[in-house]
Amino acid sequence: METHTAPQTAEARLLEATHTLLQTVRQRDLEAIDRKEAEALAARLREVLNQHAYRYYVLDNPLIPDADYDLLMQALRKLEARFPELVTPDSPTQRVGGPPLGRFEKVRHPEPLLSLNNAFGEEDVRVWYERCCRMLAERLGQPVQPAVTAELKIDGLAMALTYENGVLSVGATRGDGIEGENVTQNVRTIPAIPLRIPVDPAVGPPPTRLEVRGEVYMRKRDFERLNEQLQARGERPFANPRNAAAGSVRQLNPQVTALRPLSFFAYGIGPVEGAEVPDSQYEVLQWLGRLGFPVNEHARRFEHLDDVLEYCRYWTEHRDELDYEIDGVVLKIDHRPWQALLGAISNAPRWAVAYKFPAREAITRLLDIMVSVGRTGVVKPVAVLEPVEVGGVTVSQATLHNEDYVRSRDIRIGDLVVVIRAGDVIPQVVRPVVEARTGNERPWRMPERCPSCGSQLVRLPGEADYYCVASDCPAQFVRLLEHFAGRDAMDIEGMGSQVARQLAESGLVRPLSDLYRLKLEDLLKLEGFAETRARNLLRAIEASKQRPLSRLLFGLGIRHVGKTTAELLVQRFASIDELAAATIDELAALEGVGPITAESIANWFRVEDNRRLIEELKELGVNTQRLPEEAPAAESPVRGKTFVLTGALPHLTRKEAEELIKRAGGRVASSVSRNTDYVVVGENPGSKYDRARQLGIPMLDEDGLLRLLGMK
């Protein structure tokens, strides 16, 4: 039967060309290609980058992640640096973005709104700073070490606000940096943007003319609520908060914009008349704050480059604590007269640079979908991907959650897909790039049988997951053994997933208690095990016998019993025998357990094989009693209280602080709510601090926490 492939759309052709170029620039040494090949590659890069710039800056509908765009732009810059004659007037390296649409009135910026050059690592920041130092030394006639202001790079829509005699007169998008779009009526609907600069006697009258530059953005919680509302009305949700902010500002109907929960941060100024402006960028931010503009509280001024780099490292690790998206840190030479001395190149200032975080999102090809069997028998689809770098690591597999997830997003084998990796979260496929489809993609369905043991898969009522319910499924036991030995359970050093698989598949370990029967000669039979490695593993296994009871409970893999639940159980039951004898009602009555978990625990202990396992572990010397440090705390101000931690504490790590709170009978939560009793605040706190202030929740520093714990 003859098949017909649907013609590709313009978006599909652009994505296909982009994907090919990304593979080329990742695989080829651009320093080694000859001029002819460089000319052809540069032409393709210009064409593709200009199309993406138009979609990003004008349509506010990007097709690819920023990291992919940046990689292609870097490649073009390298080629143009090697062969300067390849630079053309229409090269995206010579301009900020695309031309504005005709739907809004055009506004010419009094001073260009330039973009920023990117720094993709600490070395790039050092190179930028040293270049600034050299240029300033040449122009000042003496060496200088300029201070740097560091600001979070808010992921939103750039905006220029013009005030005349203190009254908002124009709000304009960046557009191409020279001309933007007049979105004044929409900007007036954003509560955070002053319509009139308030007169403050301490500050003096407002400037006769002032251009404030900043970013319109949407908070994560507001974005989630907006998408819920859109989906409830049957409308298409936004892909991310940046798109939501940009799409809301550029609505033709200001009444629609007024209903969108938009926010604003001011980060700089353009032309100013009728006022004295501080010479320091950091002090400009404070001045804008006094004028009534919202300014991000995390901006800092540093005298030393090492402190700047530490700030970048901190926010790379802690950005998820914020209630808004950031995609980097903007670094600026603080002294504004020196900014003027440094000047700008065609599309970016020399005195500023954007330190970009490792990409958390990328587009790659979905090669296949396989299924993985977990320790509880849950069977989940796993995406097999064309390898791509996301979040600083190469990703070749990602989670697809369950069959409903795949079907609801119409993810097909052969699709180009968007992959994200946020923080320590497992990489996941979030959506297909439908515009890139050729017609050759294949839908996927969950197999009927377990890939490990061949048993019929079962979907339980009310659940999205399928399960293998065979008690002798080999794949389940491998995962259970790996979990049992894991860092948060029995913490057996040297026993990762590969060793767990070897021990299970060789028949040396099954059930878990066999782990404590292993002998040196058993391990020496395994591939990769010499005597030293074998003895080290045996020592680690022996040491694990004395782990706290809560770790053993977690390691047993009882469904719904995580680390926190295991700790709660040990507070109530002094031994595993006491826990095994507890009724469902007794278990469900425990705060933080509930009826579903209670039934799961009771059912686990009813299984004869599980009861036999516990007896064997006891006979082999594994601790099954509550240790003194796990005992319930005596009455104290902390017992029963809920704590939330935010920011870096001066002496305690976050894990140490959490352990101290738990030992004293307190609980640690991940987010602030009206049920929170205390918020422990360290350096550079995140949005949890703001939320605590709004709710009037008591806040403690490290010393205050230690005093409450009776340790000071």
From Swiss-Prot:
Residues that coordinate or bind NAD(+): D66, A67, D68, Y69, D70, S115, L116, E151, R174, E215, K332, K356
SMART domains associated with the record = BRCT, HhH1, LIGANc
Give the BRCT domain ranges: 633-712
Which prosthetic group or cofactor does it need?
Mg(2+); Mn(2+)
Q: Which reaction does it catalyse?
A: NAD(+) + (deoxyribonucleotide)n-3'-hydroxyl + 5'-phospho-(deoxyribonucleotide)m = (deoxyribonucleotide)n+m + AMP + beta-nicotinamide D-nucleotide
Please provide the Gene Ontology terms (biological process) for this protein: DNA repair; DNA replication
Pfam families under this entry? BRCT (PF00533), DNA_ligase_aden (PF01653), DNA_ligase_OB (PF03120), DNA_ligase_ZBD (PF03119), HHH_2 (PF12826), HHH_5 (PF14520), Nlig-Ia (PF22745)
Its Gene Ontology cellular component terms are: cytosol
Q: Where is the active site?
A: K153 (n6-amp-lysine intermediate)
Q: Name one GO molecular function term.
A: metal ion binding
- Report the function annotation for this chain: DNA ligase that catalyzes the formation of phosphodiester linkages between 5'-phosphoryl and 3'-hydroxyl groups in double-stranded DNA using NAD as a coenzyme and as the energy source for the reaction. It is essential for DNA replication and repair of damaged DNA.
Record protein name field: DNA ligase
The organism encoding this protein is Rhodothermus marinus (Rhodothermus obamensis)
